[in-house]
Structures are given as C-alpha cells and as structure tokens.
Amino acid sequence: MSNRALIEEAFERRTQLTTEELSALVPPIETGLAALERGELRAARAQEGQWVCDTFVKKLILLSFLTRENTVGETNPGRPKSYDKLPLKFEQWDDAAFRDACIRVVPGAVVRAGAYIAPGAVLMPCFINIGAYVGEGTMIDTWSTVGSCAQVGSRCHISGGVGLGGVLEPIGDNPVVIEDNVFIGARSEVAEGVIVRSGAVIGMGVYLGASTPIIDRASGEVRFGEVPANAVVIAGNRADPKLPGVSLACAVIVKYVDERTRSKTALNDLVRALSR
C-alpha cells in the first residue's frame, strides 16, 4: 500500500487507531511532511486555471498531531520557550542551509515545520503555519500571518499586519490562494478560501471572506470569493436595501492596474538581492 493510501485509510479510522498503528504511521507521515517542506507536495494546485484542493495534505497534517507529543522548543538568547507538537522550520538550520535555500529571515519570523519557503523570499517578523506555500521573491512583511495551507505565489508583497486565513477543517474547504505578482495592503484580511488572482492590488484594510460582496464600480457586477486578475480593490460599503440607514461592508474594484498603480506597488529587487 502506498504512503498516500495508508494515510487516507488511517484518517478514516482516526478515532480508532491503536498505539501500534500510530507508531507505524510515523515514517509515512514524516515523509509527507518533508515533501511539504520542499514544496513537492502542496495543499492546492492550479489545474487549467482552477485551484484544486488536495485533501490528502490536510489529512496528513491532522494525523501528524496524533503521532507527536508536545515538547519544549529549543531556546536561543532572546527567544521565548515554546511547547508544541511541531518544531520550527529553521530550528536546526545553519549558515549553509540558509545560503542553500536563498532566503532571508529577519529575527522574529516564526515558521512552523511543514511550510515551504521558495528561494528569494524575505520573511520579516511574521508567522507562517504548517502546509503554507510562499513563492519565489515574495515578501511577508512585519506581523503578517500566513495560515495553514494558504498558498502565496511568486513576487508578491504581503504588507504589514495582513492575515491570510488558514484551513485544516472542514477537509474539503479550499485554502486561501494568492496568485503571482499580487500586492496586499497593510492590515487587510483574506480568509475562507478566497482567491486573489494574478497581478491584483488589494488596498489597505480590505476584508475579504467568502460572503464579502466584491463590486465592480464600472459595471456594477457583484462577485464573491474571487478577486479578478489585475483588479485594484479598496474597502467600501453599500446601503442595505431592506434597512435604510444601515450600510454593509463590501470590497470595491475601482479600476484595473495601470502603469501608475504598478509604479506605486513595484517590488524592490534590492531587498531580494540574495546571492545564489
């Protein structure tokens, strides 16, 4: 039986697994988590323009919590103790490992094991959870959170205090997806499986969930759960037709990216200049 089939079958019986069965699951689970760390296994992939969730990844992660015990994390000067079932990704890394990975990690960045960080990425003091994927040349700015299984593409800028929601349960729910070349403004939140398509610009303080109306100012079209490619989106509100005097939060597509917008959100290659 393949590791995938073994884990799929074990997940269906997760409440009845014996101690011996859990011990036998450790090697395939550790193999799977290592594949997540290398970016070979992903919680979601684009297939013909549509993002498809791989539920196996969530089952793998959830089962790993059954096979591990909480332990005190290794401490270094200035780092508080932790008590968790997962180690931190960089806990055992040395200078050579960081050079090989071609990433920059500022003090205060916390990345749990099982997350993938691609070459050229820059991590300011942020939190990145298990199963997350961060693409090449992407910056995760200060106090931002990339939730479990969230997918962030290449050459994105995730500004300070942004929250990208994670999802492990329900199993079939899609994770948040941020495609390539996206700029997300400070203190924005993207959650509940929302997809932000390539090249979009999300303004400061925009909240996007599955039920958030995304209104195109030019056409009046209302959509949910997906920001179109190259859209420029800001926070807005609209009147509640059933209750005059009350307005409901929404997001507004004010235009599509032009050269003026792109110049304001252009990435600075100097901060990504890592020798390879």
Curated annotation (Swiss-Prot):
Keywords: Pyridoxal phosphate. Belongs to the transferase hexapeptide repeat family. Its cofactor is pyridoxal 5'-phosphate. The lineage of its organism: Bacteria, Pseudomonadati, Pseudomonadota, Gammaproteobacteria, Pseudomonadales. InterPro entries: Hexapep (IPR001451), THP_succinylTrfase_dom1 (IPR023180), THP_succinylTrfase_N_sf (IPR037133), Trans_hexapeptide_repeat (IPR050179), Trimer_LpxA-like_sf (IPR011004). This is Protein TabB. Transmembrane segments: none annotated. Pfam families: Hexapep_2, THDPS_N_2. The keyword Cell division does not apply.
